[in-house]
């Protein structure tokens, strides 16, 4: 928070997750928690409680489908697909069966039992150091509230039904909240909690509603009716803005509108530097419908297809045929551009209960997951590999293995892949004769041994999010030490150069698929280090493309030489920003 005693203007800083600037009166939405009273029931009442539960699930499913339809009609099926995760919750047989069992054993009312079971599911996901899985926890919480309201005979909450335009301030917003709000009267959104990857943030961007999250206890500091200016680009919520501030933001908004218009013109252009070097610019996706954004933003295919969603919130593992159909359809839509599929990066604790025997881990993020889990559960691994190989018949599929720590793991993974190829050949099932295989470099040991791994694969893809986290021993979602998560740390740059040099020494291409690839301030650094491909969130592709088109490889290499003489992350970042500002300063404003 910052303020000026003379003007009484007060600024609160959060994370801007949906661009745009809005000004208006605040409406503070207080959380309406559903109080669930616990009471005993007789064994003879269990059947009635089950009937109530089933009715509430049906009502909830219908409400979700109605919201999904409204979103599909107003902003498109891609965003409406967000509610598929909600439907999975109300159809989750594992969760439902546990509720039914506890009804019979605990002999308590179904509201209490359902809340207890669903809350435990959500809390388990919330403890995981993964924004995607934490978002699934919010989905469960959202659906839980809706089911309980239906069990209690209450109508859906209407606190978002504003009668005049306001800036909405809330503790948190679920996808249901965002989909249900009266968009004509919501100028902008600010919340205590949330992240850029939250479904509410995604919907806000699609609805073109400026939004800020992570303002901590902003709901306790503001009152309905206060005048605020919301900057969804840089994350500032300004209370009682001065005329000077209002005028400054009007000018900023005008400039940004011009930049946005220019970026749209780049959709059909290639990401080629001023001196003629082509940098492959791909997009990261999680769901099949994300391909819409890949196409809309002019990306050259998919540099990272996270396949984890196929395994989450379901009572059984996905079959080979189910996976094949999904991968094939995505590949066909992306063709002729490449589709790089990462084998699933989860631990056994995220799969359907009873699928594998697992033990509690103190630190699952450093534990039994990704390729480590796959190599101990060959049947699950081979099912996915066979599906990917079958989809490779489309002609543009590549595969990469996550969390490789050394040569033995990589060779074992490739051996399993070769077994799957032989099985498909024996069954005379179509697949690509030549399939490119890559290793994700996201563990320091793999970075240091990149020259040992390179001869075994066709490309290297650097997962900078985890590589930085592991190299610096920093939990990037821990607010107390998040400032130590520094992509420009001298050690990180040396690891990146080590990887790029190893790849090129063996005539491989090397890419970056972490958040660094979408940071336009760091694009000159990555090009100077020798990266051949950058894969970022689709929405960032036009900005990265413009950055690439504004640079030359020699000046980027010179930048790297200079940064290797600097001692701190802040000094290196300042030098990167200097070049970025010189070449495309309008994008940084």
Tell me what each language-model feature is.
Residues 1-333, 339-346, 373, 377, ...:
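Non-catalytic, soluble scaffold/interaction modules
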């Amino acid at each position: 928070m910052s303020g000026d005693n003379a003007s009484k203007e007060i600024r609160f800083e959060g994370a801007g997750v949906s661009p745009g600037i809005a000004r208006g009166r605040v409406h503070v939405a207080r959380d309406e928690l559903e109080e669930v009273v616990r009471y005993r029931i007789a064994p003879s009442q269990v059947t009635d409680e089950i009937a109530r539960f089933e009715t509430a699930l049906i009502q909830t499913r219908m409400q979700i489908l109605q919201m999904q339809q409204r979103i599909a009609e107003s902003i498109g099926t891609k965003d409406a697909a967000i509610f598929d995760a909600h439907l999975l919750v109300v159809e989750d047989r594992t969760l439902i069966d546990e509720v039914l069992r506890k009804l019979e054993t605990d002999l308590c009312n179904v509201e209490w039992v359902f809340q207890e079971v669903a809350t435990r599911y959500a809390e388990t996901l919330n403890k995981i150091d993964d924004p995607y899985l934490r978002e699934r926890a919010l989905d469960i919480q959202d659906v839980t509230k809706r089911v309980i309201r239906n069990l209690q005979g209450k109508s859906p909450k209407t606190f978002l039904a504003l009668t005049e335009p306001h800036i909405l301030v809330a503790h948190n917003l679920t996808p249901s909240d965002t989909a249900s709000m009266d968009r004509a009267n919501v100028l902008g959104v600010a919340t205590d909690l949330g992240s850029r990857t939250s479904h509410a943030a995604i919907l806000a961007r699609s609805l073109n509603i400026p939004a800020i999250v992570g303002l901590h206890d902003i709901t306790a500091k503001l009152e309905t009716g206060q005048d605020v200016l919301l900057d969804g680009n840089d994350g500032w919520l300004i209370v009682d803005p001065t005329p000077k501030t209002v005028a400054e933001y009007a000018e900023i908004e005008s400039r940004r509108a011009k930049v946005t218009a220019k970026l749209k013109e780049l959709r059909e252009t290639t990401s080629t530097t001023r001196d003629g070097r082509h940098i492959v610019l791909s997009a990261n996706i999680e769901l099949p419908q994300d391909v819409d954004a890949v196409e809309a933003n002019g990306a050259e295919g998919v540099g990272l297809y996270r396949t984890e969603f196929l395994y989450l919130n379901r009572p059984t593992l996905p079959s080979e045929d189910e996976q094949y159909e999904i991968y094939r359809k995505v590949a066909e839509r992306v063709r002729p551009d490449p589709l790089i599929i990462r084998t699933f990066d989860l631990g056994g604790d995220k799969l359907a209960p009873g699928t594998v025997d697992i033990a509690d881990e103190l630190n699952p993020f450093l534990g039994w997951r990704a390729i480590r889990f796959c190599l101990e559960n060959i049947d699950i691994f081979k099912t996915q590999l066979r599906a990917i190989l079958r989809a490779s018949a489309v002609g543009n599929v590549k595969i990469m293995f996550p969390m490789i720590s050394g040569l033995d793991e990589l060779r074992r993974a490739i051996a399993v892949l070769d077994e799957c190829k032989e099985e498909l050949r024996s069954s005379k099932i179509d697949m690509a004769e030549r399939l490119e295989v890559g290793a994700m470099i996201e563990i320091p040991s793999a970075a240091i041994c990149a020259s040992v791994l390179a001869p075994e694969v066709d490309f290297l893809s650097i997962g900078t999010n985890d590589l930085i986290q592991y190299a610096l021993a920093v939990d990037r979602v821990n607010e107390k030490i998040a400032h130590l998560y520094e992509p420009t740390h001298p050690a990180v740059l040396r690891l990146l150069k080590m990887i790029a040099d190893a790849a090129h020494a063996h005539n491989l291409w090397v890419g970056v698929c972490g958040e660094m690839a979408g940071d336009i301030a760091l694009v000159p650094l990555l090009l100077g280090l020798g990266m051949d491909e950058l894969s970022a969130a689709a929405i960032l592709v036009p900005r990265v493309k413009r950055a690439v088109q504004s640079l030359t490889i020699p000046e980027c290499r010179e930048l790297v030489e200079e940064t290797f003489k600097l001692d701190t992350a802040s000094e290196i970042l300042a030098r990167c920003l200097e070049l970025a500002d010189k070449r495309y300063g309008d994008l940084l404003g």
